[in-house]
Amino acid sequence: MIPAYVPNSAAALFGGGTPIDLGRTFSDGRRVFGDGKTYRGFFGGVVSGVLVGLIEIWAATAFSLSALPQQTFLSVTLLATGALLGDLAKSFLKRRLGKDRGESWFLADQYDLVVGSFLLILIFDPQWLFGTITLPIAVWIVVMTPLLHRVVNIIGYYIGVKEVPW
């Protein structure tokens, strides 16, 4: 899951520039995603997640770290991309519900990356998903994701990368 946890933070670091929705509005008159979702942030986040995943693959082999999941280039790419696609889907829904950029949305803010990652990997690499994500790992993901999300966002807020600490 590490390749899925990295992209959101990296997107905040690399963000800025052209919004993915190019400033367009949806049929409800609201922005599709908003200014917070940019091409630079999206691709910077995905590349960062993939690079961390490749380091994980190398470390697992080089240091015989059997506790790490058996990752592949495909799995780390799907996890990283799915995390940010989940974030985009959440932003789309937030705009439809009239929520502002940065406004907290309990549970959706914490689990969008998990849902996006798992959905993408379920579609393109279900063998990896069912062979790697056991019940104890799934429980760990459900419990730890909101905690990690909160800690990382607080750090991002204090170093000036995020406008709000959630």
Swiss-Prot record:
EC class of the enzyme, as a word: transferase
Protein name per the record: CDP-archaeol synthase
Pfam family, one: CarS-like
Its biological purpose: Catalyzes the formation of CDP-2,3-bis-(O-geranylgeranyl)-sn-glycerol (CDP-archaeol) from 2,3-bis-(O-geranylgeranyl)-sn-glycerol 1-phosphate (DGGGP) and CTP. This reaction is the third ether-bond-formation step in the biosynthesis of archaeal membrane lipids.
Alphabetical keyword list: Cell membrane, Lipid biosynthesis, Lipid metabolism, Magnesium, Membrane, Phospholipid biosynthesis, Phospholipid metabolism, Transferase, Transmembrane, Transmembrane helix
HAMAP family assigned to the protein according to its UniProt record, in alphabetical order: CDP_archaeol_synth
Keyword Heme set for record: no
InterPro entries: CarS, CarS_archaea
